[in-house]
Amino acid sequence: SNGSNIDVAGAVNTLVETAGKLFQ
């Protein structure tokens, strides 16, 4: 992602991706 909220967006994206892998 990009933009001024990259840190927040990146953290959320990481959590979503991790959750997606765990609950596949």
From Swiss-Prot:
Gene Ontology cellular component terms for the protein in this record: chlorosome envelope
GO BP, one annotated term: photosynthesis
Principal localisation: other
Localization annotation: Chlorosome, Chlorosome envelope
Keywords: Bacteriochlorophyll, Chlorophyll, Chlorosome, Chromophore, Photosynthesis
GO molecular function terms listed in the Swiss-Prot or TrEMBL record: bacteriochlorophyll binding
GTP-binding among keywords: no
Function: Component of the photosynthetic apparatus which may bind the chlorosome to the bacteriochlorophyll a protein monolayer.
Similarity comment: Belongs to the CsmB/CsmF family.
Designated name of the protein: Chlorosome envelope protein B
Gene name of this polypeptide: csmB
